[in-house]
Structure formats: C-alpha cells, structure tokens
C-alpha cells in the first residue's frame, strides 16, 4: 500500500505540499509511520515531523456499480437481491403472482382467474368481463384532419328557464339615470350645509357651491330631456314615452337645486347685511370686513348665473304641450283633465288653501300622497317666480350699496 503524496499536516491545512527531492533519505530516514519521501518545506520551517500516511481503501461503491447491481436479473429471492428486486418480488395481492425485475410476469396469467374459482381478494368481481377493444380509444388518437364531430358550445336549455348570465344593473339606462339623480340631490344637500357654516369667505363665481349649482343644473336638464324624449324601442303592451319613476326623481332633484339657489341668495344677503352695522362696532372689535367692491362684483355675477339657470329649468320643465301630454294632471276626485301648468299660466294658478294646510301637517285631514304631490307640482312655477324676485331685490340693494 503506497503513501499519500501530501503530508498529513498539509492535508489538514488544505495547502499544497512542497517537497525538495534532494533531501530524500538523508534528513528523513525511513521509519514506522514515515515514508521515503522527502519532508515538505512547510514542516521543515515549522520544525515538526513530516508524516505521510498510507492511502485507505474506500468502501463506497460507484453509481454505475449500484445501478448494475440493482438491475441485475440474477437471483430474485436470494440474500444478495437488490432493493428493486425485493420490492418487485412481492405479490400484487394475496395469492397473486410474483413480479420480477425484468417485469416478465406481467404478461402472464393471474392465478385463480379463468380457472372457474373466485380470487380471494376480488370477491364479487365479474371474471367474465370482456377485455377492452383496441378500437375503443381510436378516436382519442385520431389525426387532426379526421372528422370526429363538432363539439357543441351552445348554452344548455335544460336549466329550468333561468338565464345563464347574471343581470348587470349598469347596462340598464333607467338605473343609471336614477343613480345620477340621487347623487345630484346628495350633492345639493351637502352644498347647502356648507353655506351655513360660520366664518366662511364671501361667495365668488369660482366657489365650489356655485360650480356645483351650475354643473348639477346642466346635468338635471340633460336627464329631463332624456326622460321626456319618445322611446322608439318601447314595444311593451302599454307603450309610454316617460318613465314615471324617473320623472318623480327628477322633480325631487329639481327641488333640491331650487333650495340650493335659495341658500346661495341667503348667503349673499347675510354678507350684505353685515355691512349695514355701525362702523364704530367694527372699529371697537378691531375686525375688518371681507366684503368690498370686488366681492359685490362677484355677487352680481353669481346672481346673474342663478337667473340664467332658473330660466333654463323653466324651458326644460315646460317645453311644449306635446311633451307634457303624459304629465297632464288628473283630478283625484272627478278624474277630469286639467290644463298643463306653463310659465304663462303660472301666475293664474292658485293652490287650494285646504290642501296647503294639509300638506303643512295641520289639523285638516290630508287628502293622501297624490294630493300632496299635486300641490307641490303646482307650486313649482311660483317658487321660480319668487326666487327671481329675491334675486332682483339683491341686485337692487347692491346697486345702492356704499361698497362701490
């Protein structure tokens, strides 16, 4: 058995062993545990013995030897059988055949089957079953060009009549308009709450509340035009040109916007009234007013915008007699038709005091929801006219104001 080519110290330190062959047997005589190799330079410098150990035989077998032994079809049940042979040598079931490493027994006959007796592990198994036909799965491996019959992708009609797709509410234009009207009413109420906050700056044309009043009025007018437009796609038994639920929602949104217009006028009126207080009071408190000539000019433009929006809503509400044919009011008690209310006839409409008291919650018994709604609709032209008068009064007040 030969010695290693590196000394034990260099192998332990995992460095290269440097030797001087000229110093072979003189400085390192042969002795037990030592070889005839010359000592390495590292051991000489360290002053230690340079020892070369003998090579040891490795007990690990190579991968090729393991594979060759495991797949050797030699003895199957002997003591030298590999793990693969021992695993395959076990029967698949009780009383079944043994399977060897060459898998040759797989094509043999199973004991007990076909001999007239039942197999212990297959009680109840039909031994007369026919083998699978080779052509049974031919369609699975058919060429691409072979006509194997089209696969139907049509929805099944045996689902009890229910739609296979879920209904999308966003596709319904009526629901979309209803959502827009609800959002407009909420925006108007939030704007009115902001207008009554204390210590707020005077309104201008670019104030958020004024911008919302302009945008929401344009949106409401566009929705009202859609509601009153004829629906040519309506093929129902009772065709109508107006969706009544949307009409009531639009009227409710109109009332919110009119209330917002009135709140804007009230905010301007409060600012103007604050300037009529004695100047001595402001001098004692040391406060200066934010309302000046520039604010008055902004007030004038805001009021002109409100007047323009009211006139536009008038034209949209009372477009023509033909567009109001489905909005003509019917008397609850007699069922007779009444003339549509237009701006020209608005001043001649006099609401019934009894109905107004009933709507206000007095002791007079109310006539029902229809009577209340009819009274509200009849007062819409009067509300517009009163709002115009308030705007004109504010404009006149600012013309004679001392802030110019």
Curated annotation (Swiss-Prot):
GO terms for molecular function: DNA binding; DNA-binding transcription factor activity, RNA polymerase II-specific; zinc ion binding. CDD domains: GAL4. SUPFAM superfamilies: Zn2/Cys6 DNA-binding domain. InterPro entries: Carb_Metab_Trans_Reg, Zn2-C6_fun-type_DNA-bd_sf, Zn2Cys6_DnaBD. Residues 160-174 have a biased composition (Basic and acidic residues). It is found in: Nucleus. PROSITE patterns: ZN2_CY6_FUNGAL_2 (PS50048). It comes from the Eukaryota. Its main location: nucleus. Residues 61-82, 147-177 are annotated as: Disordered. Transmembrane segments: none annotated. Disulfide bonds: none annotated. Residues 147-159 have a biased composition (Polar residues). Keywords: DNA-binding, Metal-binding, Nucleus, Transcription, Transcription regulation. Transcriotion factor that specifically regulates the expression of the gene cluster that mediates the biosynthesis of gregatin A, a fungal polyketide featuring an alkylated furanone core. This is Transcription factor grgC. It comes from Penicillium sp.
